[in-house]
Design a protein with these regions (language model features):
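Conserved alpha-helix/loop element of class I SAM-dependent methyltransferases that forms part
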Residues: 2-18
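Conserved class I S-adenosyl-L-methionine
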Residues: 20-28
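Class I SAM-dependent methyltransferase SAM/SAH-binding core
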Residues: 29-68
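A conserved beta-strand element that flanks and buttresses the S-adenosyl-L-methionine
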Residues: 80
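Short catalytic micro-motifs in class I SAM-dependent methyltransferases
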Residues: 83-87
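A short, conserved alpha-helix within the catalytic core of class I
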Residues: 88-100
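C-terminal alpha-helical "lid/dimerization" subdomain adjacent to the S-adenosyl-L-methionine
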Residues: 112-171
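Core SAM-dependent methyltransferase catalytic element
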Residues: 170-188
Length: 188
């Protein structure tokens, strides 16, 4: 996990300033949130539906509803969602969750997603998603979108897409498919 943490943190860290607060929605064990807080000197809070036995000791918000983030409006500078949206079975509900993230963010939402570029990528996406998540009981509905589809969906639904970038992660998937970062800035 350490190699994956470092790769994810390298993508997210430039978008979080020292002293800012961030909420990691879908934080899992909190390993990435802890590492990101350490690197950026920011204050992390974890948020997830599932209680993990090995969850890192961070401030924690327990979700009881997958479509609602249990926090007040604009209560964190930044909201982070790492590989969360493709675990939501209905595409419409993915937008609800993204809107919830923006509701609690003062500045921006950082979304990292698996984004297959072609059919071969999609096959590897599905295989790795199943291998990495099935044993934890995490939903795996395979609701992936391409980078262009996500950018269009975000833009057409009122989000301001300030930055996007794609890369092939080395860990844990050995660069078999793409991840994309979307920086969604608060309007106004």
């Amino acid at each position: 996990m350490f190699l994956r943490e470092n790769e994810v943190v390298r993508k997210l860290a430039p978008w979080i300033e020292p002293g800012e607060s961030f909420l990691d929605v879908g934080s899992g064990t909190g390993l990435i949130a802890r590492r990101l807080a350490h690197v950026t000197k920011a204050d992390a809070t974890a948020c997830d539906l599932h209680e993990f036995d090995n969850r890192i000791d961070l401030p924690y918000l327990r979700q009881t509803d997958p479509l609602h983030v249990p926090a007040a409006d604009k209560s964190f500078d930044v909201v982070v969602m790492c590989f969360v949206l493709h675990h939501i079975p209905e595409w419409e509900d993915q937008l609800v969750v993204a809107a919830e993230a923006m509701r609690v963010a003062r500045k921006r939402v950082l979304v990292l997603e698996d984004t297959p570029f072609n059919k071969v990528d999609l096959v590897f996406n599905k295989a790795w998603d199943w291998v990495l998540n099935q044993r934890h009981g995490i939903p795996i509905p395979f609701t992936f979108r391409s980078k262009e589809q996500w950018r269009d969906v975000f833009s057409q639904n009122g989000f301001r897409v300030g930055h996007t970038e794609s890369y092939r992660p080395k860990w844990p998937t050995l660069a078999m498919y793409h991840h994309s970062l979307f920086v969604l800035d608060r309007r106004g």
